Amino acid sequence: MDLETKVKKMGLGHGQGFGAPCLKCKEKCEGFELHFWRKICRNCKCGQEEHDVLLSNEEDRKVGKLFEDTKYTTLIAKLKSDGIPMYKRNVMILTNPVAAKKNISINTVTYEWAPPVQNQALARQYMQMLPKEKQPVAGSEGAQYRKKQLAKQLPAHDQDPSKCHELSPKEVKEMEQFVKKYKNEALGVGDVKLPREMDAQDPNRMCIPGGDRSTTAAVGAKENKLAENKRTQYSCYCCNLSMKEGDPAIYAERAGYDKLWHPACFVCSTCHELLVDMIYFWKNGKLYCGRHYCDSEKPRCAGCDELIFSNEYTQAENQNWHLKHFCCFDCDSILAGEIYVMVNDKPVCKPCYVKNHAVVCQGCHNAIDPEVQRVTYNNFSWHASTECFLCSCCSKCLIGQKFMPVEGMVFCSVECKKMMS
């Protein structure tokens, strides 16, 4: 397929999840409606992951595409219908007998994802070492956490040009080369193993503090005894605390098998969130999630959330923007050369600021222009003018004077305050 055809086929999937309720805004949101180039809802400005959208198939396609053309193809299967790679997510179902007064019932727990290991007891141990609120039990807070992290850590628009907004053929080519490079050099999936099993595979390895291992072979009975003792001294590469005997550890092939992590310590070095499904990116001795690895390699547009592959872009408010995406967060008007105000780290044009965000003057009850001086006390504001910042009793101008505040009123003296009480 040539680049022109690829560009024409691009679309952001605007029909997906349409009308789904927002789990954060509740009834304040009319239902999910994807913005035409931002990755947020047009109604409430929350992301798709904050809405009750069934995304399991879409997420499995996304991860499947990530693993395509890598050594992790054993984790994907291609659909016969369209050849799309699907992530073979390992689902774990545990059944626990629960004793009641008369009968024994079966309590079933389904994990929406579990480490792909043959030993289910090891997978169960791994899950128990995660914080309760991050265990991906179906229908739980942990499952919702995993869903959010899949969206946050592995954005589809970081690997698939068809999920991006109006890329040029040149940008498509550059993105494809970038994705190929990080698949070859950084992408990995953690392995859950017992440290002693790793030693059994290579008896010459001995563990020393910090998770690092030496390759000095033991010679003689005393040396063998010393080596055996040292093998129990495992420590986590992240927290440097010791690993308990019999507990599972996570290894990352890109990092080398001389390093290991507690399950709860296998986190992104930037956002410090659990690496979703143990999918990591390794760079300069650090673990990253997909998002923050890409951020370390390319600028990201604060408007559309996509990586920038163009040589021309703008920087404002310590953020990067596609030239066409430096827009008002409320009305999408271009802000180049215009006056704007930052509201919650988002640029807003002056008319939208006055209409939607400006504070109201307690004196004249009109919105206060962002370029006009004002007086603020607690949650109340006034125009800093002789017409507005006045004693609520005698109308004396209080600019530069002492005053007594009472809720939304101000007084020049105790006498004026008493007269209004």
UniProtKB/Swiss-Prot annotation:
- InterPro entries linked: LIM1_Testin, LIM2_Testin, LIM3_Testin, PET_domain, PET_testin, Pk/Esn/Tes, Znf_LIM
Q: Start and end of every PET domain?
A: 92-199
Q: Does the keyword Zinc apply?
A: yes
- LIM zinc-binding domain residues are 234-297, 299-359, 362-421
Top-level taxon of origin:
Eukaryota
Disordered: where is this region? Answer: 133-164
This entry carries the following GO cellular component terms, namely: cytoplasm; focal adhesion
Share an example GO biological-process annotation for this protein.
negative regulation of cell population proliferation
UniProt-annotated location(s): Cytoplasm; Cell junction, Focal adhesion
Reply yes or no: does the keyword Aminoacyl-tRNA synthetase apply. no
A matching Pfam family? PET
Basic and acidic residues bias: start-end ranges: 155-164
- Annotated Gene Ontology MF terms? zinc ion binding
What keyword terms does UniProt attach to this protein?
Cell junction, Cytoplasm, LIM domain, Metal-binding, Repeat, Zinc
Assembly state and interactors? Interacts via LIM domain 1 with ZYX. Interacts (via LIM domain 3) with ENAH and VASP. Interacts with ALKBH4, talin, actin, alpha-actinin, GRIP1 and PXN. Interacts (via LIM domain 2) with ACTL7A (via N-terminus). Heterodimer with ACTL7A; the heterodimer interacts with ENAH to form a heterotrimer.
**What does its UniProt record remark on the domains?**
The N-terminal and the C-terminal halves of the protein can associate with each other, thereby hindering interactions with ZYX.
Annotated function: Scaffold protein that may play a role in cell adhesion, cell spreading and in the reorganization of the actin cytoskeleton. Plays a role in the regulation of cell proliferation. May act as a tumor suppressor.
PANTHER family cross-referenced by the UniProt entry: LIM DOMAIN-CONTAINING PROTEIN, TESTIN
Q: Which family is annotated?
A: Belongs to the prickle / espinas / testin family.
Name of the protein this chain belongs to: Testin
Species of the source: Equus caballus (Horse)
Q: Which gene encodes it?
A: TES
